[in-house]
């Protein structure tokens, strides 16, 4: 261009107009393509959501802003993984500290570009999977952008797949991390460990004390209680919207879908197929597919082509065999299909086996028993198979279906180790939502820290017996451990007394007016209940002394998962009528304590209100009876334990109450109580009540000992 202009200074340039337009067009197009390539490179090098922005959110930074770190050849290299590491030896729990939410804080290191002395990058661009993993962590409640608050550190160095890694240089990059400290409290994620020809079952990168969330651990490389065994993520099952299939018998009893398996294993499987014919299907790689058909989504048997992973839904059991690596992505595909995995891989540590009960969802068969696998599976009852099919699908939905699910499950396991008193229960890990107790966690464990609120809350259900109510309030207020008194006013046609008329007591007194007159109102989880212990007491129970109530509370503190009460009752089997009978006579046994005066954990208010099986709650409210029996059934069914009757008192008759006031005096009432027991037993599908022949009394009760020296001198008479 310059030469042309110089040689034609006396006239216009000799470039035709159309040619100039075309050149401008191509230059512009080239510029756009170049900018697009630069933008694509920036996106690939930078993972989503790992840098904290000024507003506390997450931002994506330009590749130009990523600092370059040069690693000299003699940079320090961490020691190889310490196989003796356990949480109490290699993890610094003091970095985590105590916090009210019992949540660890996880810090993600900023992205850096590591290069060697020659300027060659140590690793390639961060993979899509690792990008998703970092995003999941940064979007979670665990994430913190303050390195000083962090308990756990996650590098932005992608080691998910060992294949492209430069082992030495990657280890040197890890050692450059600002808080590395021999890998203490650092977490690495790796799904494809090892390299040919040996294919080690754990990441070969030297990592010292760092925790490893690895896919494909063996019993030789897995540090139990320290490392976390995770699934090998399957993009195929994650991208395939495979509808859930109802449990039950399927076309094939046993199916093998893996392609690259050892020839000896394939011979064993083909021998089973030859023996059992159409009930066994052994698939292999397709060799006759049309051009353009994705081979990864097809499997073949002889010349028959099957869609994969859809074909897995046609089988009851699916084999999961070791390949070059011990961990296989096919496990995720099998679980998604609701096919029960038959794991034939000796020494394999199943994913999340620290918390997941794999006996409920899989069958593990030793490799030497592979020829007997068909007969082994035939011995499993059909009902159990269907439960395993449901459980397999549930495991995939909860823990396998996405990188996010894998990341959060890993962090939860580590969190449970650090805060064991707030750990997720076995049921919460393993029970599908249809059978677990929903969002409120069961607090009935051995606590490692004291409850936030001591004492108990007394809940008095009343309708219009004001004089008796005031006497109950006065007596209960004398109990030293009383924290609050809550009156549930169940009368919609009459206002409660004016505030000035209520007894003056030392603890807060709150009146709650209900919208409807229901007995179940006494078991509602009111926000005003701040203590763990609840005393349910009727407005006519005026005979209990403060010593009796205080002793009952202290017994409950020793057994917080029990119903601890005073009026004892019994259920009996009537052989003549062939049904259950309610018994209120004095006997040597009890199986219930009435909630007219009983202590229990406030957790059961939640279960009673929101999780009571069947129509029991509506039955109680309709018949205006048996709410106490329903609570006894509920507690016994949840805990599997009997009630505890305290103190010898058996008479709970209100001296001023007439026969009209006292429902228990009516013979019809007793018949209805028997009907309730039979109704509830039918709904629960069992009789959960446990019969016991003992009660709890103070140690010095009836001993010839000075009353002044007894802790509970006024226990009272029968």
Curated annotation (Swiss-Prot):
SUPFAM superfamilies: Nucleotide-diphospho-sugar transferases. Pathway: Protein modification; protein glycosylation. It comes from Mus musculus. This is Exostosin-2. It comes from the Eukaryota. A protein binds at residues 582, 584, 651, 653. Pfam families: Exostosin_GT47, Glyco_transf_64. UDP-N-acetyl-alpha-D-glucosamine binds at residues 465, 490, 517, 522, 538-540, 627-628, 673. Glycans are attached at residues 288, 637. The chain crosses the membrane at residues 26-46. UDP binds at residues 461, 465, 490, 517, 538-539.
